[in-house]
Amino acid sequence: MFSTAEGSVRRCFFLGIVLAFVFIMYPIKKNMKLKPNHILIYDVVLLVVAVGVYFYQIIFKEELIAMGRRIGTPQIIIGIIAILVLVEACRRVVGIPIIIVAAAFVAYTLLPMGADKPLQGTIYNLVYTTNGIIGTPIQVCSTYIFLFVLFGSFLEATGIAAFFIDCANSIAGAATGGPAKVAVISSALCGMVSGSSVGNTVTTGAVTIPLMKRTGYPPEFAGAVEAAASTGGQIMPPIMGSAAFLMAEMTDTEYADILVRAILPAALYFTGIFLMVHFKAKSIGLKGLDKDSLPKGKDIFPKLYLLLPLIVLVFMVIQSGTFTMAYSAVVACLVAIVAGMASRETGSKKVVMLLAAIPLLVYSRGEG
């Protein structure tokens, strides 16, 4: 990622790298089992082709601009390959249905409805302009979402998820139906960092679901509570799902405004789940956890420094007239790295986090 790079260059670079990781991480068949650190030859070929076709647009950017819509046969072939590798990547990650929908819309553009060369125009618009593949969603991903996901990863590496679960246990663990309430509160707290329903479920569910089952909740209810609570991570400020960033970009609204307006819906969502859990626990006579087994304030207080990166991020995002979103995320990442250096949870990850700080410092100089 280059903070000073032109928009289309940044988008192509980002997409090429993302596709490379897709072909490394997702096998051609979902159930295919591969040896650790083993990549099949055709995945390597697809990786190289994917990087090549999108980096081609970076290297020959000026020539492509000069051609405009009058692209030649080589550019059409490269464009078709760019579409096909993207389709294959989507198939591996999302599945067939989205491919069918996309193919239907692309096929519609190829209908001869007055255009002399519909294929040439379609390839040009889809591949070589910011109205197609490298449009607004990729722009938002490469500029904002990537950095906010990186921030969440750094923060999770510091052990903040365990800190949030300890806080939730301390607050509600001893209450009626304590474990389920802990699941709701910890999911809300972790949702502030992850912005992901799946990530939230994996992080908190590994602790809260077994805890709920041990205290008498039916297994299906325990799973449902965690799934419902973790879904709220998508709408829990300050880091919400990707849709929030797209909303800000497409409506030309400051992310800070969306962040503030999301507080009430998120609060109502988690309050509703919390009350449902409370009444369910009352109806089946479930009690809370033993107070002696719960974290004490003296155990939680020394870890309050883990909240500093989150506080810095919220402060800078609210000051949207002073700091850009990207700059706010980068600074928050750097603060998270500093917090990680002080945390025992990071362990061997400290070296990786320090190495990651170098490009982030370079990026911040460009954004600042």
Residue ranges and their predicted role:
Residues 53, 151-157, 186-200, 228-235, ...:
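Helix-loop-helix module between adjacent transmembrane segments
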Residues 165-233, 243-246, 252:
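Hydrophobic transmembrane alpha-helices that form the pore/transport pathway of multi-pass ion
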Residues 56-60, 201, 214, 234-247, ...:
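Transmembrane-helix bundle segments that line or gate the permeation/cavity pathway
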Residues 8-16, 139-149, 256-272, 324-333:
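Alpha-helical transmembrane segments
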Residues 260-366:
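Long, contiguous bundles of hydrophobic transmembrane helices that form the permeation core
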Residues 1-66, 76-80:
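Conserved, well-structured core domains of diverse proteins
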Residues 73-77, 131-144, 170-184, 215-221, ...:
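Membrane-interfacial loop-to-helix junctions in multi-pass transporters
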Residues 5, 34-38, 64-150, 167, ...:
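Hydrophobic transmembrane alpha-helices of multi-pass solute/ion transporters
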